[in-house]
UniProtKB/Swiss-Prot annotation:
Disulfide bonds: none annotated. It comes from Cyanothece sp. (strain PCC 7425 / ATCC 29141). It is found in: Cytoplasm. The keyword Protein biosynthesis applies. Keywords: Cytoplasm, Elongation factor, GTP-binding, Nucleotide-binding, Protein biosynthesis. This is Elongation factor G. One of its GO terms (molecular function) is GTPase activity.
Length: 706
């Protein structure tokens, strides 16, 4: 089957932002104007296309990254409600990502497979902590982006304040290509700084737009920002810079070409504005997606590794060997959906592919593309396409799918560690079986959701990125899998580490008639770098310990560290060097060395000044200034460290680092402390040593439970 849309006319984009910036509404309007839906969905009515899970519709937030395919033809500048004569249709694959920090993995995995992003900002709230997180994720994968300043109809809307915040807080070269005409309830149109024309909206559904002169009272401001736009474009291109310095005007085509070049290179971030809810600015936003965001052929070719370790790249080309990345798993009435971004080659229905990450062959039974709740079966996915495959049993998030004849492994995803856990217990024997199925299915879908069994209590423990994350997963267990379960109170994911180097040994000898047991290791332990986990090095020479016993000794140490030594929490950031030992020709065994390794590490950790670490959260609180004192006092009482405060138009913003252990239930507390007028956001920052008095209480409690 031939390609229906040339690669140059494909856009793979994400819509990302902080919670409540209006991403889902923006997506709904895009689907409405591009003809995917014929009735506008509203978040507050719970009938949007991309929020299709029950939990999403109830809470009015997006949890999973919904993938949708649509099409757009550029509008006629003289009549923006109609396609431009002679313009060609573009295919747009859109991922609507969640803004709540507990669902960061959804943003992370969508950034990995996108070519461009629309970053949506609220014109009132501006740059929020989650905006910074999303921006960092886009930076990590060098994703070009355009900005849409939304909610310009809201009280307190200020386009220019958001412009300053993006430049100052995100250190981005934001370049407005539009200015709003009016704001709040007087928002009536937009100025196009590329064409230097105005668009006035004559109705509230965006179907009657008049192209006209720039209002006289805004001409000076428009000229000022037009100059900034031309300067930014000239800086992105030497030829345009030369023309600009010689005093010549740049044409519309040159400005667009320079903006495109700068956006794709990451040196320019075009800024647009409007109100998705009031249907203003959406068609022009879609035009900007086509004008400024890259096609799959315009981003760097995906990097991969061959089986022999050689670095290789795969270009976006149907003729190249197949290379695709599984970026999401989802349970569905259709079966297990594996979302795939095809980077090169063609993925065909009914074909066998190699999962090079696992070294296993898989059969693609069916392929579908999604329009949220609608699943459309297709015969193939080509280079640059996003879609979902059915029939894959061993493929998980981050795995590479490729041709068996041309194996390659693509770079996987960055997956953050969970910071909060709860114990779950099935209510009945029947629930026990259902619970294990539910947990397996949910952990396949979400790599930040971890399941383990506490060896002391035999309880099943689930861990995730925050209270809301676990709350929604437990809710899904009850609703989708019909599991009756009792859920314990949230527990903090503490860690243990060491502060000084030591040398010690572990010797396991058992003689009780017949074959004995003998294992002996000598180790040096030292603190590792933050984030280094458990590092093991063997410096055994001369066969003092045979090679076949070094692995089991390491395994014994690793398992002891995973179980915890000081208070039962995993030991991290330490380097262990095995320097000596001894063995017995007859009595030594792998098990004896595993036990000796475990004994050595336990002794070493207890002698190396062990400490407890706790997750610290970056907390940002916004409250009316009248409540500032009580909110700051409350944060300090939670062992918080205040890092900064600002005030704008009667609203105070406080940033602090606070231990996660002291933030449980904070959502309820801040509501009662501020008469329901305070809001806060929280994300994981780093691990920090627990104060001695607090640590002693935690250790004593854990030893009492043992």
């Amino acid at each position: 089957m031939a390609r229906t849309t040339p690669l140059e006319r494909v856009r793979n984009i994400g819509i990302a932002a902080h919670i409540d910036a209006g991403k889902t509404t923006t997506t709904e309007r895009i689907l409405f104007y591009s003809g995917v839906v014929h009735k506008i969905g509203e978040v507050h009515e719970g009938n949007t296309v991309t929020d299709w899970m029950v939990q999403e519709r109830e809470r009015g937030i997006t949890i999973t990254a919904a993938a949708i395919t649509t099409a757009w033809t550029k509008r006629d500048p003289q009549n923006p409600t109609q396609p431009m004569p002679g313009a060609l249709e573009h295919k747009i694959n859109i991922i609507d990502t969640p803004g709540h920090v507990d669902f960061t993995i959804e943003v992370e995995r969508s950034m990995r497979v996108l070519d461009g992003v629309i970053a949506v900002f609220c014109s009132v709230g501006g740059v929020q902590p989650q905006s910074e997180t999303v921006w960092r994720q886009a930076n990590r994968y060098s994703v070009p982006r355009i900005v849409f300043v939304n909610k310009m109809d809201r009280t307190g809307a200020n386009f220019y304040r958001v412009y300053d915040q993006i430049r100052d807080r995100l250190r981005a070269n934001a370049v407005p290509i539009q200015l709003p005409i009016g704001a709040e309830d007087t928002l009536r149109g937009l100025i196009d700084l590329v064409r230097m024309r105005a668009y006035l909206y004559k109705n509230d559904i965006g179907t009657d737009i008049e192209e006209t002169e720039i209002p006289a009272d805004m001409q000076e401001q428009a000229d000022e920002f037009r100059t900034k736009l031309v300067e930014a474009v000239a800086e992105a291109d030497d030829v345009l810079m030369e023309k600009y310095l010689e005093g010549e005007d740049l044409t519309e085509e040159e400005i667009r070409a320079g903006l495109r070049q700068g956006t794709i290179a990451g040196t320019i971030v075009p800024m647009l504005c409007g109100s998705a809810f009031k249907n203003k600015g959406v068609q022009l936003l879609l035009d900007a997606v086509i004008d400024y965001l890259p096609a799959p052929t315009e981003v760097p070719a995906i990097q991969g590794t061959l089986p022999d370790g050689t670095e290789v790249e795969r270009k976006a080309d149907d003729a190249q060997p197949l290379a695709g990345l599984a970026f999401k798993i989802m349970s569905d009435p259709y079966g297990r959906l594996t979302f795939v971004r095809v980077y090169s080659g063609i993925l065909k229905k009914g074909s066998y592919v190699l999962n090079s990450t696992k070294g296993k062959k898989e059969r693609i039974s069916r392929l579908i593309v999604l329009k949220a709740d609608d699943r459309i079966e297709v015969d193939e996915l080509r280079a640059g396409d996003l879609g979902a495959a059915l029939g894959l049993k061993d493929t998980f998030t981050g795995d590479t799918l490729c041709d068996d004849s041309a194996p390659v492994i693509l770079e996987s995803l960055f997956i953050p560690e969970p910071v909060i856990s709860v114990a779950v217990e099935p209510k009945t024997k029947q629930d026990m079986e259902k619970l294990s199925k539910a947990l397996q299915s949910l952990s396949e879908e979400d790599p930040t959701f971890r399941v383990s069994v506490d060896p002391e209590t035999n309880q099943t423990v689930i861990a995730g990125m925050g209270e809301l994350h676990l709350e929604i997963l437990v809710d899904r267990m009850l609703r989708e899998f019909n599991v009756g379960a009792n859920v314990g109170a949230p527990q903090v994911a503490y860690r243990e580490t060491v502060r000084k180097p030591v040398r010690t040994e572990g010797k396991f000898i058992r003689q009780s008639g017949g074959k004995g047991q003998y294992g002996h290791v000598v180790i040096e332990l030292e603190p590792g770098d933050p984030g280094s986990g458990f590092e093991f090095v063997s410096k055994i020479v001369g066969g003092v310990v045979p090679k076949e016993y070094i692995g089991p000794a390491e395994q014994g140490m690793k398992e002891a560290c995973e179980s915890g030594i000081l208070a039962g929490y995993p030991v991290i950031d330490l380097k262990v060097t095995m320097v000596d030992g001894s063995f017995h020709e007859v009595d030594s065994s792998e098990m004896a060395f595993k036990i000796a390794g475990s004994m050595a590490i336990k002794d070493a950790v207890m002698k190396a000044n062990p400490v407890l670490l706790e997750p610290m959260m970056k907390v940002e609180v916004e409250v009316p200034e009248d409540f500032l004192g009580s909110v700051m006092g409350d944060l300090i009482s939670r062992r918080g460290q205040i890092e900064g405060q600002t005030a704008t138009e009667g609203i105070a913003k406080v940033t602090a680092k606070v231990p996660l252990e002291r933030m449980f239930g904070y959502a309820t507390d801040i509501r009662s402390n501020t008469q329901g007028r305070g809001i806060f956001s929280m994300e994981f920052s780093h691990y920090e040593e627990v104060p001695r008095n607090v640590a002693e209480a935690i250790i004593a409690k854990n030893k009492g439970n043992a």
